[in-house]
Amino acid sequence: MADTTTVVVERREVAEGRESSKANHIGEERRGYDVSRKRCSISVHGGGTEGGGGNMRTNYRELSPASLRIHRKSSHDIRNTLLGPDGEVLHLHDPSGKGGDGMGKMPAVVKPIKLKSIVTKAESYDTMHGKASDVMSCSREVCMGSVMTPHVIGTETRKPEIVQQHAKDFLDQYYSSIRRLKSPAHDSRWQQVQKEVEATGSYHLTETELIYGAKLAWRNSSRCIGRIQWSKLQVFDCRYVTTTSGMFEAICNHIKYATNKGNLRSAITIFPQRTDGKHDYRIWNNQIISYAGYKNADGKIIGDPANVEFTDFCVKLGWKSKRTEWDILPLVVSANGHDPDYFDYPPELILEVPLSHPQFKWFAELNLRWYAVPMVSSMLFDCGGIQFTATAFSGWYMSTEIGCRNLCDANRRNLLEPIAIKMGLDTRNPTSLWKDKALVEINIAVLHSYQSRNITIVDHHTASESFMKHFENETKLRNGCPADWIWIVPPMSASVTPVFHQEMAVYYLRPSFEYQESAMKTHIWKKGRDSAKNKKPRRKFNFKQIARAVKFTSKLFGRALSRRIKATVLYATETGRSEQYARQLVELLGHAFNAQIYCMSDYDISSIEHEALLLVVASTFGNGDPPENGELFAQDLYAMKLHESGHHQAHSELTIAASSKSFIKANSRSDLGKFGPMGGRKIDRLDSLRGSTTDTLSEETFGPLSNVRFAVFALGSSAYPNFCAFGKYIDNILGELGGERLMKMATGDEICGQEQAFRKWAPEVFKIACETFCLDPEETLSDAAFALQSELSENTVRYAPVAEYESLDRALSKFHNKKSMECSVKRNPINLHCEMNGTERSTILVEIMAEGIDYEPGDHVGIFPANRKEIVDGIIERLTGVNDPDEMLQLQVLKEKQTQNGVYKSWEPHERLPVCTLRTLLTRFLDITTPPTRQLLTYLASCCGDKADEERLLMLANESSVYEDWRYWKLPHLLEVLEEFPSCRPPAAVFVAQLNALQPRFYSISSSPRKYSNEIHLTVAIVTYRAEDGEGAEHYGVCSNYLANLQSDDKIYLFVRSAPSFHMSKDRTKPVILIGPGTGIAPFRSFWQEWDHIKTEMVDCKIPKVWLFFGCRTKNVDLYRDEKEEMVQHGVLDRVFLALSREENIPKTYVQDLALKEAESISELIMQEKGHIYVCGDVTMAEHVYQTLRKILATREKRTETEMEKYMLTLRDENRYHEDIFGITLRTAEIHNKSRATARIRMASQP
């Protein structure tokens, strides 16, 4: 983490180890400790930590004094350096962060403070105090620990150099916390802050810095017993507010959020920062919610005596009160230095709790009450040198705050004696302990009243236990925990709580919450105005008017709150479907939240801890892998998980672990139970809404994402054994990191009902999110419902002719966000089945000239295909609105923008589709062969001239089972749909705007870059099929037939996708088993060519022992038979096995059958010789091979089922079991049928 090392010297009292009387300098005078004596203890902190982040554990080591020496840099330099046994410089900790005083003095050595628990005898050492700020008011002679406000901040502003010092310290803390200390981002941000401070004397915190600082300030609050909840603080950034009415609106929203129908949530609202001390924003109330106090002429006080002065001030402002015992004071705020305004709260906003006792019925007759949410509003938030003078911080009550202090203190309600008399206690004799007895019963009443109404409160015993856990955690994580014993110890039953017996060190860290002078004392009233004269005229309203106003005001609060709560949607996709759903979700959320969308690869993981609402739409690639643009996010979450559990791994190890299939499998299981692999409890919304008192401070609810509410929609195909594995992994690990699950993860199956599942999930999660953040879902849901059914029309989409356009490769690159490369075909594709009979399928070898393209054997190439000309031409004939399909056109969308002058509309280019001809768009960019979605069918129904066509299309669109049966039976492309409904004539512009992207197709590279430089070879099976049980029209696989029809010198557009998990092992001493039937042999051709090149060109290099298992239908279609025989002759392939599944007079045999026959040898190759297994083929074959190898190894090694499963996962983790798996194809009808049946059962079972 750090490039310096902090030395902490701990004095140990031994015979000769006395403290030196010379304590000014290190050297002849050794800063308090004589290191020439027999022994001292040195703790090295910073340089020896792992992970590069804050909150690291200290690595301790003990050094003998003989191993230390003092080094003077020069005869003219009185600054000395303490050297370790290996000559390393042991820098001394400088609590000021200035690196010395510039006058030759070294920074102070931090002496650990030993703190003991008197009861348990446990000891801890606090070195965190070395980072304390110098605001202690105690002197060498006098302790000021019991002073109520030892340090009060006035209206003076800081000097720019002091601001910079604080800013540097804060930024160091912030970037350490996200493990980016000294990174380019850190350096850039520090330079930006320096320039801003030099120019203006101040600077502005980013939103994430503000959120981090607010949480850290709570964590640093030495007087707070409930700090274990610090990471769950909700921060409302209201620095944009400029008026008192805006402040009132924000405070009301805060109260609504924090109250949460009694399940209280901690939150802070932060208004604009101090500038010059003359334009401060202030909240004049000490607490946002409090009861008024009125002093009568006879000296008697009605209400709360603590608020008499402020109540009188409010009355002078013009506030009209009822002068009862329980009047809620108005909110008094001032903005930008102006005079204050007061505001009455809507009555329904404040939750109050009538007090009663479980045994004493008369207690309720006392008509006592208290409010639910405590909200401190008089303190200054000091963060990074910036002072925020107006903040409101809310949590929940510890019962003694109400029962002991508010109700029983002599200067408050002073109810102790009246209640004791009601209890029949003798109040004349203190030895009767009447005060103690009454105090206990009052606190019982408070707890009973709150708990019986499911309103969050915590008793002092639970709070004390939670603080001890926090104290222990902080000592481990930060080497100390500032704690003010006088404030931490509860006001009753003190000695029976553990905190009473715990020694504590009180010191102050920044960021912090500080006491500040009351606005009543510091405010400068505007000329000609006086607080006593500043009275506001009030209108009288009848009941109906008040009711309407309250309802309207509540709606305003809800809308304002929605603008402040950010919702982030993340997606990971291979085909674009997840992105499509994510964008629909963002549009839906935008009706109630400040919604943003990111691809996982573009998301800054350091922001995730500060998210309020996180929704994830994630697809699974292959048999459980994350999509390429989700891999880094998966690794980042895994790193966060390891960091949280105290484990640390090298980045390379982390990458392998986080991207291995076993990693995804192990973390995607839905049967992990209540506890995940970390032992961390998964929190969902049902848990969070229980309102349990003890759960509020339960340590099990914490984690780095404990303030994040999340939900996941996972996309996948049930044809794969690891269905939706990546989405399940994201859902599980977010929960394990402490996130609050809004609702159970939903899945969308590509085989059946995916769109239906999403359309069901999206409104549900939207409604729950609104409820969670106290927004009105009824008001917004009706508007938001249109987001999922938004219809483009001829009024909002149009085609416009343009002159400028981009080349095809540039357009493809932008459209797919991939670097498209233009290559050419070396020669016409070669048919690899020269001897096949007419009924066999064909496989071709495609040779591409790819100059300057780097790849490794095992990598994939993505081909951008083209749709068939006859389909494109047929669709164009049925479209309207475009006269010339070969004219360059730009698709434009009518956008609405909210401005100060109202709604502004303008035509803007489509965010995705390029400028090109309609023919090119349908040929190269849009998917016209996949059966249309139900949403598209709904649109097509609106374009029909015939009522029967319209009704039939609407039935398909609205009835899920009818649609699925039609889709499965016909598998129609768009031309066939338009032919089936001939009256459908859609406008071209609206039609193309509805279509999905034509996705690239991936193929394993079949050539070695060393043997065929500047070439890429592909082994491609030509796909053709007929729907309707073989009786329908012939359909053609888009890409395979596109490749088959290429001719020499034709242009082709592609990109290479690295597949590191399928690369050849660098350790060529280990044997290799290759298993791949049919075109699964494709990557193995690149392997044997590579080994052949190594053996031929690099004489001294060895190649591994290689066994190849290949399967096909008949001998006539044995792919690359001659090449394989040649490789056997060259000694590249040691053994080649051929499985034939349809050869006459030979039993049907598959590759796994041959593997079983060689069980003993395979077991030895894997278990004893530590060999590698490579499997390439469709998902069904891959699963059969996996189970076969599992069976072989279990039988030979006599292992249990559990042991074998663990070993197979270990093979993956060691990167010795490699898979390159195809999706299901239409020719595997039985698999498709089974998967579809499973998907329909899953859909039917969902509520």
From Swiss-Prot:
Cystine connections: none
Record region (Disordered): 13-33
Cofactor requirements of the protein: heme b; FAD; FMN
Binding site for FAD: 855-866, 998-1008
Segments forming domain Flavodoxin-like: 567-766
Inducers of expression: Detected in the midgut and carcass soon after invasion of the midgut by plasmodium. Early induction is also primed by bacterial growth in the blood meal.
Entry keywords, A to Z: Calmodulin-binding, FAD, Flavoprotein, FMN, Heme, Iron, Metal-binding, NADP, Oxidoreductase
Activity control mechanisms: Stimulated by calcium/calmodulin.
Ligand binding ((6R)-L-erythro-5,6,7,8-tetrahydrobiopterin): S146, W487, F500
UniProt remark on cofactor binding: Binds 1 FAD. Binds 1 FMN.
Amino-acid positions noted as binding heme b in the UniProt annotation, renumbered to this chain: C224, Y515
Ligase is among the record's keywords: no
Residues that, per the record, bind L-arginine: Q287, W396, Y397, E401, N406
GO biological process, one term: nitric oxide biosynthetic process
Enzyme class name: oxidoreductase
Presence of keyword Metal-binding: yes
A Pfam family per the record: Flavodoxin_1
Binding site for FMN: 712-743
Location of region: Calmodulin-binding: 537-557
Swiss-Prot/TrEMBL catalytic activity: 2 L-arginine + 3 NADPH + 4 O2 + H(+) = 2 L-citrulline + 2 nitric oxide + 3 NADP(+) + 4 H2O
Residue stretches making up the FAD-binding FR-type domain: 795-1065
Binding site for NADP(+): 1073-1091, 1170-1185
Molecular function GO labels: calmodulin binding; flavin adenine dinucleotide binding; FMN binding; heme binding; metal ion binding; NADP binding; nitric-oxide synthase activity
Family: Belongs to the NOS family.
The protein's name in its UniProt record: Nitric oxide synthase
Higher taxonomy: Eukaryota, Metazoa, Ecdysozoa, Arthropoda, Hexapoda
